[in-house]
């Protein structure tokens, strides 16, 4: 018996939801990630008859990214860093690691949305330029530009943190 569209949709959601949540979390932060995922799944469900659910990963990623970017465009949206305990050898090292992670997250959060989305998909999802271009509805050269500029801006933002850290350590 052939699987129905609804069966394939449910299977796709079960199979991909953890990865999609990670993408949403990387783009909008943990506070809004579940909302982004739920809205993306709802949008897909409402239009499930339109799509081929035999290979849904790309469609689902693109929908989550689009929903995350839509949410970021809303003026009241602010990013919140995750509060995961650090895994360090000592409490002091753990505090330093947590501070660094928090600064990286803040720096990523301050990037323009397309730079942030491209970086997340490239660095966290290990997607190719072609895949990122498909998800973000852009050309491959545009994706390369976003990645280059995003990395450069991220490095500049983190350099300020590193310089500040050196001053604190020198005291």
Enumerate the predicted regions with their spans.
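DNA-recognition helix of helix-turn-helix
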Residues: 65, 69, 136-162
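Short, aromatic/basic-enriched loop-to-helix "N-cap" motif that marks the start
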Residues: 48-63, 140, 145
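A short pre-motif secondary-structure segment
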Residues: 118-122
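Short, small-hydrophobic-rich alpha-helical interface motif
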Residues: 20, 24, 33-44, 60-63, ...
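C-terminal flanking helix
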Residues: 17, 21, 41, 112, ...
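Short, charged helix-capping/linker segments at alpha-helix termini
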Residues: 1-11, 21-39, 47-55, 164
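Arg/Lys-rich amphipathic alpha helix in sigma70-family domain 2
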Residues: 62-82, 97, 160-161
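Acidic, proline/glycine-rich intrinsically disordered inter-domain spacer in sigma factors
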Residues: 7, 78, 83-109
